């Protein structure tokens, strides 16, 4: 069994309204040293696979077909063997 972790973030230059809203709220609460907040999506997928390389290839396909929008998202995949 393997655990694949996918971290999806907005590409540089794409507006992040959620991060901006959080930053403004933190400033309103007195955390005036906060200048920027970035939000990410993290997805853990537990799956069977032949080896780490094959699992990563399959998760890459999942990202391309469903999990990420290549126009606005960058993503990173980490795979680890689990018991």
Curated annotation (Swiss-Prot):
Reactions catalysed: N(2)-formyl-N(1)-(5-phospho-beta-D-ribosyl)glycinamide + L-glutamine + ATP + H2O = 2-formamido-N(1)-(5-O-phospho-beta-D-ribosyl)acetamidine + L-glutamate + ADP + phosphate + H(+)
Gene Ontology CC: one annotated term: cytoplasm
One GO term (biological process): 'de novo' IMP biosynthetic process
NCBIfam families per UniProt: phosphoribosylformylglycinamidine synthase subunit PurS (TIGR00302), PRK05974.1 (NF004630)
Protein role: Part of the phosphoribosylformylglycinamidine synthase complex involved in the purines biosynthetic pathway. Catalyzes the ATP-dependent conversion of formylglycinamide ribonucleotide (FGAR) and glutamine to yield formylglycinamidine ribonucleotide (FGAM) and glutamate. The FGAM synthase complex is composed of three subunits. PurQ produces an ammonia molecule by converting glutamine to glutamate. PurL transfers the ammonia molecule to FGAR to form FGAM in an ATP-dependent manner.
Subunit composition and interactions: Homodimer. Part of the FGAM synthase complex composed of 1 PurL, 1 PurQ and 2 PurS subunits.
Protein name as it appears in the record: Phosphoribosylformylglycinamidine synthase subunit PurS
């Amino acid at each position: 069994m393997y655990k694949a972790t996918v971290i999806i973030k907005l590409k540089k230059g794409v507006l992040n309204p959620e991060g901006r809203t959080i930053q403004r709220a933190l400033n309103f609460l007195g955390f005036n040293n906060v200048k920027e907040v970035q939000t990410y999506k993290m997805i853990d997928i537990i799956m069977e696979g032949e080896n780490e390389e094959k699992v990563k290839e399959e998760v890459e396909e999942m990202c391309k077909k469903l999990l990420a929008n290549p126009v606005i998202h960058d993503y990173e995949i980490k795979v680890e063997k689990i018991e």
